[in-house]
A protein has these predicted regions:
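Ligand-binding pockets and gating/stacking loops
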Residues: 1-169
């Protein structure tokens, strides 16, 4: 919560327009409350629950991170700016480093765009795009933020197709 407030204040005071915040690195020695092993080791050791379809202990950290992300968005939404809030006027791009932590999968990486981007972003959409390059989300974020980017990525990950479903006309 403290970091969420500090980042929001930095944006509100115009001390920064862009930031990168890493909650925890994939190989950091982060402990999940109630666990004796570090998070990274749990991702490898914990079996996938056959009924749930995921690793419940591993998912606890994801839940805590999402709570922090939600707190950050609330901080942005609480700051009045112009005819709306700071959240209405900015764009936040959040993502995980893997789709399935146990094997460090790069497929189905959860990615989120939040905020109104000054009216350029149509929030509230879930886009499921199996087999698509994750760089499409990055290109979309750049264009929503007003960057003159026509393409992004390299090799097989190169794309010139933003996700237009989330872009206001």
């Amino acid at each position: 919560r403290v970091m969420a407030r500090l980042l929001a204040m930095g944006l509100a005071c115009d001390q920064s327009r862009v930031f990168n915040f890493v909650h925890t690195g994939g190989t950091s020695e982060t402990y999940v409350p109630g666990q004796s092993k570090i998070y990274h080791q749990i991702t490898h050791d914990e079996p996938t629950d056959s009924q749930l379809g995921y690793q419940p202990e591993t998912s606890k950290l994801a839940g805590l991170v999402m709570e922090g992300f939600g707190a950050f968005l609330q901080e942005l939404d609480a700051i009045q700016e112009g005819n709306g809030t700071l959240l209405d006027n900015c764009l936040v791009f959040a993502l995980s480093d893997t789709g399935y932590a146990k094997i460090h999968s790069l497929e189905n990486i959860p990615m989120m765009l939040a905020g109104g981007a000054s009216g350029r972003h149509k929030a509230g959409h879930h886009v499921h795009a199996p087999g698509e390059s994750v760089t499409r989300v990055s290109l979309t974020a750049m264009q929503l933020a007003g960057a003159p980017a026509g393409e992004f990525g390299s090799g097989s990950m190169r794309t010139a197709r933003p996700i237009t479903d989330v872009m206001a006309s």
